Amino acid sequence: MEAPLPDRLARVGTPSAAQAIVQQTAPERSAARPTPRWADAAAVVLYLALACWVTSGLWRHIDALALVNGGSDVHFFEWALIHATRIFTHGENPLFTPQLNAPNGVNMMANTGLLGLTVPLAPVTLLFGPAVAFTVMLTGGLTATAWAWYHVLSRHIVGYWPAALVGGLFAGFAPGMVNQVNGHPDLVNQFLIPFIVWRAISLRTARDGVVLGLLVTWQAFLNEELLFQAGLAVAVFVAVYAVFRPAEVRARVRPFLSGLWATLLTAGALLAYPLWFQFYGPQSYRGLPEIVLGYGTDVRAFAAFAQSSLVRHGASHSSYGGPPEENTFFGAPLLIAVGLIVVWLWRRHVAVRALTVVALVFAALSLGRTVKVGGHTVLQHGPMSLLDHLQLFDSVVPTRFGLALVPVIAILLAFSVDAAATTSHAWLRYGWTLVLVAALLPIAPWPVPAERAAPVPGFFTSGQWHQYVPDDESVFVVNSVFWVGSFTTMDWDNATGQAYRMVGGYFLGPFPDASGNYGPPLRPTAELLINIVQYGASTRITAAQRAAFRADVRYWHAAIVVLSPAAPHYDQLRNVLDQLTGRPAQRVPGALLWDVRTLSG
C-alpha cells in the first residue's frame, strides 16, 4: 500500500509529475515535518568541515600548489582563472584567449572554460592568486553540491531530515566526487544538478520553464558533460516511471510542454551565440580525441576502493584506473547495501525501480567501447561502441558516465534511512544503521595529496622577459613540446598574469581534419625536439631543418626560445637549439634563452 502525499509537498501547489513520483516513493514514509533551521545550519557546517578536510593539503601549500595526482587539468583551470580576470583588466573575449597556443589562440568555450565560476571568482584571483581561487572552487564545490542535494531531498523527496543529510553527504563526498578534486573543479561543482533535475521533473508552467532555462544556461558555463548526463538520466527515469504509471505521466505531458517551451526559449536565447562559438567559432573542433573515447570503467572497479577513501589512502594506483577518474570505486560493502535497498523497496517504490534502471544504464555506458574485467578485455564491443559516433556522446569521457551513479545511490540511501525511521521494528532501525556504517565508513573521504609546485624561473617572475618580447610576439618554451612540459610552460605564463603569448600548451584544439586533439598540430621543429625528448639521441642539424626552424619561428611570431633545466635530455636539446639558432644560449635566471627576433622578423 502506498503512502499519501505528505502535507509538506501538498503545500507546494498543484500536484506535479515530481510530486506524483515522490508520492510513490515511500510506503512507510516518515511524517513530513518542516526541517528545523538548526538542522540546515548543521548540514552546512558538516559539509564545509568535510570539504576543508578533503582539501586540507591544498590549503597547506596554497602559495605554490601542485596536486600529486592532479595531472594536467590543474594547470589549465588555473589558466582559466587568470583568463577570467583578463576579461575585466584587458577586455579579453570571455570565449577565446589569444595568449595560449600562439598564433592561433584557444576556444575557451570548447575547452570547459568554467566561466560560470571563474568570472564570479575573478576578484579572489586578482587579490590572492589562482591557487587560492582554485582551492576555493574545490572546497566550495564539495560543500555546495552536498548542500544542494540535502536541500532538494529534505524539501521535496524525504520527510526525515537525517535521511536527507545522509543523501547529501554521499552526493557530495562519494569516492568519485573526492577523486575529481584531483583536478576537475568543473565536475566537483555539481550544485546546480539537483535543482535542474527537480525542475525538469516538476516542470509545469512558463515560470518554471524560465527558471529551468536560467539554471541550464549557468550549468552550460560550468560543465556541459554533466548537463547532458542529467538530461539523459531524467529521460531514462521518466521513461521507466511511465512503464509503471502510464496514466500519471500522460496526464502531465501537457503541463510539462507548457513549461518546456519557456525553457527552450530562455536557454536558447542566452546560449545561442556561445554554442555557435563553441562549435563553429575559431579553433573549434568535433568530438574528443580517440584515446579519450577509449577511457572506460573496469567491471571490477565498482567493488574496489578508491585512493581517496579511508581504507586505501596512500596506496598505489589500482590496476582498474587511477585518480582523478576513480568515478565508480564504491567498494563491495556499499554495493551490497544498495542491493539490499533495491530488494527491500522495489515492490513498493516506483522511484526505486526507475532509479535502479538509471543506475544500470549509466553503469553500462561507463564501461566504454570495450568491456574489461581485471584489466582484460572480455567483450570487444561495449555499450559505448554503439553510441560514441553520435553527437554529444562523442564529447563525453565514457568512464564519467559512472558519476551519475553517485546521486542515484545518494537518493536510494536517503530513501532507506527515511523508510527505516518509520518502521516499528527497533531491530530494523538499529540493524540498518549498522549496515550503513559498515558500507560508508570504508569509503569515508581522505585528504587529497598535494605538494609544492616547482618554482618559476626568475627570468619570468622578475619581469626580465619584457626586454625581449614585444606585445605582438610570443615565447616558445621548449618544454611545451612534451606532455608534462606544457604544464610547466603554462605555469610560467600564469606567473606573469598571462602577460605574454605562449606557443603550445595544454588544451583541446582542432587538427587539420577538424577533429579534437590535445595541443596544436606539430610543426617540424616540435617533431624534431619531441624525438630528442623521447630518445635522447644527439642530432647534427641539416640545412633543411634550420630552414624549417626559421619558418616555424616566423609562424609562431616567437621572440625568444627558452629551455628549462628540468627538461628531459637537457644537454642534447641545448646542443640542437644551438645548431638551429646558429648561436649559443644566454643564461638567464632559472633557464637558457635564445633570442630569435632577427629570425622572426
Where are the regions that the model predicts?
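Membrane-interface coil-to-helix junctions
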Residues: A51-T145, G172-F191, Y295-S318, V373-S385, ...
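Membrane-interface helix-loop-helix junctions at transmembrane boundaries of multi-pass membrane enzymes
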Residues: P246-L260, G339-G382, A419, T423-R429
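Signature aromatic-anchored transmembrane alpha helix within multi-pass, membrane-resident enzymes
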Residues: T14, W261-G268, I411-A444
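Membrane-helix boundary/interfacial segments in multi-pass membrane proteins
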Residues: L67-G70, Q180-L187, D298, S316-E326, ...
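Start-transfer (signal-anchor) and selected internal transmembrane alpha helices
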Residues: M1-L58, S258-L264, V343, H349-A359
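Periplasmic/ER-lumenal interhelical loops and adjacent helix-loop junctions
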Residues: G71-I87, F256, T263-L264, A269-W344, ...
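Extracytoplasmic
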Residues: E290, L436-G601
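Membrane-embedded helix bundles of polyisoprenyl
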Residues: Y47, W53, M137-H156, Y160-F244, ...
